[in-house]
Design a protein with these regions (language model features):
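Bacterial N-terminal signal peptides
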Residues: 5, 11-25
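Intrinsically disordered, low-complexity terminal tails and linkers in eukaryotic proteins, enriched
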Residues: 27-70, 91-227
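Beta-edge loop/turn motif
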Residues: 78-81, 129
Length: 227
């Protein structure tokens, strides 16, 4: 009976992986972008990537100042910021395609909230929500190390496919939400774990785009979709 159950589990995992592979080219862009009215794949819900460094705060960009790169478009708050970006895009682009830096440590391309961010070692990291940011801050170096190693293998994959594969075949260092919460509570006995509903796998992987919670105000202030 145990052998049968193990075989069934493996079959289910292979079925999920096969589905994920079929989605690689059709479902989910490789970047955490959302389409504007013109159909352009806008990053950071239209927030200015340069302003995180120059202003130290999330700052809305303007479609008047935009730069189109392969598979992604950035808005800027000013022509000056646009010029800074043009001179050195690598310096200002968010890490891991703008996906949640916490999820990237487990090969998951999920979530993007431009108001949940951190600059660490001169690199911009974006998180899917307050839970992802809180988890990442437990050990930034650990998360960056694992994400940097995994990212080359998933960078070109659509976000749905990459995430489905990651859930089906978890990396050896995978941690559940409960495990991360337990680590947090041990390190921060006087601070409660953030109360936040991430929205569920169906919405996050199938019916919504990266950044939908931030854009639509799901449990937080609505940032809106880019024009």
């Amino acid at each position: 009976m145990l052998k049968f159950a193990m075989t069934l589990t493996l079959l289910v995992k292979f079925a999920i992986a096969a589905l994920a592979l079929s989605l690689l080219s059709a479902c989910g862009t490789p970047y955490a972008s959302v389409a504007n009215r013109a159909g352009e794949p806008v990053m950071l819900l239209g927030y200015d990537p340069v302003a995180y460094f120059t202003v130290g705060a999330p700052t809305k960009g303007n479609a008047q100042f935009k730069t189109n790169l392969p598979d992604r478009t950035y808005y800027f708050a000013s022509a000056e910021n646009q010029a800074l970006f043009a001179a050195n895009p690598t310096k200002y682009e968010p890490q891991y395609g703008g996906f949640c830096a916490s999820g990237a440590a487990f090969a998951i391309k999920l979530g993007s909230d431009p108001t949940a961010w951190q600059i660490y070692n001169r690199r911009l990291f974006i998180f899917g929500d307050v839970l992802g940011q809180t988890a990442w801050q437990l050990d930034p170096a650990w998360n960056v190390d694992h994400a940097d190693k995994l990212w080359p293998s998933i960078a070109a994959k659509g976000w749905r496919a990459a995430s489905l594969q990651a859930y089906a075949f978890k990396v050896p260092h995978y941690k559940t939400g409960a495990q991360i919460k337990s680590e947090y509570e041990l390190k921060n006995p006087s601070k409660p774990w953030p109360s936040y509903d991430p929205g569920g796998m169906v919405k996050n992987l199938f019916s919504k785009q990266p950044g939908w919670r931030s854009a639509e105000g799901f449990g937080q202030a609505a940032q809106g979709y880019p024009d």
